[in-house]
Amino acid sequence: GVDENGKTLFVRARGKLKRDGELLVGDFVELSDSDGETVITKVCPRSNSLIRPAVANVDAIVAVIAPSPEPDLALVDKMLVNCKRAGIDCVICINKSDLGGVGPGEIEKQYGSDASAVVATCARRGEISELVAAIRGKLVCFAGQSGVGKSTLVNALTGEDRHKTGEISEKIMRGKNTTTSARI
C-alpha cells in the first residue's frame, strides 16, 4: 500500500477481506497495527471501480494502442463503454507514433466524442508531452494489449525503470506479457 504521504507500506489483508477478494488496486483502506504488522481492517467506499482492469478510485483510464501489434479497437470500445458507465475519463493514447499506422486524426474521428482526449506518444523517444497534459493531476490506470508500450510509457512518465519491458514477438506479432501486475 501507499500512505497519504506517498510512502510505500507493506500491508496484509486478513479475514473476510482476504478470503472474499474484496480489495482492488486503488482502494482506500483503514489500517491498524497488529503484532508488528500493518493490517487492512476496512475498505472505504469507492468513488468508482472497474472489473477489467480491476481498479478503484481512478480519475482516468489510459487506453494504449499502437501500430504494432495491430490495434484491437474492440478492446478500446469495451474500455470506453466501461469507463462511461463508471464515470471515469478515458484517454486514448496512440503509442509508437514513429511507426506510422493509425493516426490521432482517425482515432479522434472515430472516438473523439467518447474519449476525454486522444494523444500520440513515442515513449522510447520521450515524446510524451500530450499525454502528460491529458493526465496531469489525475490518478490513472494504463490498459491495453500486450506489447503496446504501457510499461515503457510508465517508465517514461516516472523517469524510473520500474517496469520490465520487452519486444514484440516476431513469430506471433504480439507482446510477450512482460508486465503482469497492477500497482498505483
PLM regions with names:
Residues 1-73:
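N-terminal accessory targeting/assembly segments
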Residues 46, 64-67, 82, 86, ...:
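Conserved, well-folded catalytic cores of nucleic-acid-processing
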Residues 58-64, 85-97, 115-121:
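Conserved beta-strand/loop subsegment of P-loop NTPase cores
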Residues 74-84:
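Histidine-anchored nucleotide/phosphate-binding helix
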Residues 82, 110, 184:
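Hydrophobic/aromatic ligand-binding patch that stacks against planar heteroaromatic rings
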Residues 98-148:
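Canonical P-loop GTPase G-domain recognition
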Residues 146, 151-152, 156:
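Walker A/P-loop
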Residues 159-184:
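Switch I (effector-binding) loop of TRAFAC-class P-loop GTPase G-domains
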